[in-house]
């Protein structure tokens, strides 16, 4: 199992790693963040992983680079039966593109905006395999090779202006 986690996506990845390890799988985890300060739960992930590769954008911890570079390093040296990716949408998109190239089944856990948790509002809708799915009721895990990440990222950015204004108001207090 290749487990790829980025930023706060490492947190929900931890129990998945633990479950795969307890089931007797070899687990290699690739953790990534912009800098050392943003790598979370490293010790806990190490407890349940056979190997951990750390990637940081600035090279302040582990290797300098992206999660996909660490993942491809693993893919090129040993057989990977499945990949799990949780993190920023852009990270999951490029992890999915990488694993698709090597025909590795990949699951992504989406962090789409959710409002009501029932699918009624439609805020978390995402296109998977050409069909509309609702992250809150149909997911959050989906076949990463079927997800329209570009559409999802566009929808995730829909409230950036409001988020920025709220942050500025909060910081000015």
Name every feature range the model reports, one short phrase each.
Residues 48, 66, 73, 88, ...:
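Short, surface-exposed, charged/polar-biased interaction segments
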Residues 39-41, 79, 118, 133-136, ...:
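Short linear functional motifs in flexible/disordered or boundary regions
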Residues 1-115:
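FNR/FR-type flavoprotein reductase catalytic core
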Residues 10-12, 89, 111-141:
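Local cysteine-cluster metal-coordination motifs and their immediate loop/turn environment
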Residues 23, 27, 76-82, 106, ...:
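Short secondary-structure transition/capping segments
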Residues 96-97, 101-102, 123-161, 172:
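Iron-sulfur (Fe-S) cluster-binding segments and ferredoxin-like electron-carrier domains
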Residues 166-173:
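Short amphipathic alpha-helical segments
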